[in-house]
Amino acid sequence: MAIATSTQLARALYDNTAESPQELSFRRGDVLRVLQREGAGGLDGWCLCSLHGQQGIVPANRVKLLPAGPAPKPSLSPASPAQPGSPYPAPDHSNEDQEVYVVPPPARPCPTSGPPAGPCPPSPDLIYKIPRASGTQLAAPRDALEVYDVPPTALRVPSSGPYDCPASFSHPLTRVAPQPPGEDDAPYDVPLTPKPPAELEPDLEWEGGREPGPPIYAAPSNLKRASALLNLYEAPEELLADGEGGGTDEGIYDVPLLGPEAPPSPEPPGALASHDQDTLAQLLARSPPPPHRPRLPSAESLSRRPLPALPVPEAPSPSPVPSPAPGRKGSIQDRPLPPPPPRLPGYGGPKVEGDPEGREMEDDPAGHHNEYEGIPMAEEYDYVHLKGMDKAQGSRPPDQACTGDPELPERGMPAPQEALSPGEPLVVSTGDLQLLYFYAGQCQSHYSALQAAVAALMSSTQANQPPRLFVPHSKRVVVAAHRLVFVGDTLGRLAASAPLRAQVRAAGTALGQALRATVLAVKGAALGYPSSPAIQEMVQCVTELAGQALQFTTLLTSLAP
């Protein structure tokens, strides 16, 4: 090797996990031999160190250089004869002058074979805190592996690593005295002695041929020595899978495998996510399209759906007033008008002569489905039908024309022809007739709901109920009246005939003003309860609102013969 040996030692300040094959793994308190200091050979921030016979780079900020002691004698290189099967060489007794091994004097004359003498076990016990029985196991070659035990805080048993040091440098590092004289010639790397790098090769070869010699710390993948002691620290999984990996010391350091030998994932998370997305896309592409979702019946369909455009008749309109239909633009008018609802017996009269389009629309058997049919307007809010409601509505003249429709209530509307002012009859175009037919039926349902809500509110007021009971009834009144106002506003914008727009806007404006007054009166009655004048004002406003709603509904009914 071209690297010159060094006597500089460094102590590990933190645990380190190797992230590359060139990096060493160590734990806090380990003593490493510095081969090249930081900055030497282009290693900025790294030191080239040796630990347990392994060389690698070490982060310079995780180790601390120890003060250099006096150079030891070169007698450590040729070690004393080693006993066969014993992994720990015994350096010469001339090492007593070194400052690295702070060991009491009785530890030196400890015998190397056979049962130890009396003064030998007490000294190692005070230094390494090992069981007393381990001092008597130096005779057998396999039992010699348990001589170098570490403090109980580390809970580890030494292995065949040539550099077996305690976990903390605060403890004395010398345990070479009890070694038999016949051990291997591989010296410890801990003493401050220059050792030729050529002497490390036979040491590694001698270790490779011996089975019970795994290192204590995590070893790279190139040194695969299976033993139960590998589980004490972080070890690669392929080493733990060997047959000898089931010792009693397994799981002492139960930490995740963070080293470079962690088993790679068969597929990265990003690839898994992309694979799942591709699979989902294929399933969606093969699946049939979802069935058409039917529209739910809702009384608010007029406000939720865009209004269609009025069809422009091919024949000129008989109305003398110019039609502004071609000038109306926008998304609301760009869609065809839905087919009109079925004619009511009372409202269905002979169509305007010369109107072929309306007749074709009625006679067309393949017409589009009317999405506005079957909407139960009067029953949406689940009004409470009180007993006195039928009597109050029975006094009003029933509309004989409405009896043919089972969906419309039998409360009845007044005769529609009575609301028309005397004069020349209004000429309505085909598109306006379709709008009137559609919204006239809607107004009948809205007015029926308004009647039920007004009857419930009047009954609650007569019973002198608190606001928490009559305010919900007033909300239903406001909602039903607001739908009528919306119908008037829509007809005022979409009607092609100017006289028709004027009449509808006038009736809708009066209804909106009555609705605004009713809302203010209900708020005043709720805040001033139990004030009789406030209740009376609310009753008057509700009565006026009901009258305006009746006039508006009658107007639309009369305009759609």
UniProtKB/Swiss-Prot annotation:
Residues 103-123, 308-325 have a biased composition (Pro residues). Residues 352-372 have a biased composition (Basic and acidic residues). Residues 5-68 form the SH3 domain. The keyword Transport does not apply. GO terms for biological process: cell adhesion; cell migration; cell surface receptor protein tyrosine kinase signaling pathway; intracellular signal transduction. Pfam families: CAS_C, SH3_9. Keywords: Cell adhesion, Phosphoprotein, SH3 domain, SH3-binding. Residues 68-123, 171-215, 240-372, 390-422 are annotated as: Disordered. A motif (SH3-binding) lies at residues 305-311, 335-341. Phosphorylated on multiple tyrosine residues. Phosphorylated on tyrosines by FYN and SRC. It comes from the Eukaryota. GO terms for molecular function: protein domain specific binding; SH3 domain binding. GO terms for cellular component: cytoplasm; focal adhesion. Residues 438-488 are annotated as: Divergent helix-loop-helix motif. Coiled coil: none annotated. PANTHER family: CAS SCAFFOLDING PROTEIN, EMBRYONAL FYN-ASSOCIATED SUBSTRATE. Docking protein which plays a central coordinating role for tyrosine-kinase-based signaling related to cell adhesion. May serve as an activator of SRC and a downstream effector. Interacts with the SH3 domain of FYN and with CRK, SRC, and YES. Belongs to the CAS family. This is Embryonal Fyn-associated substrate.
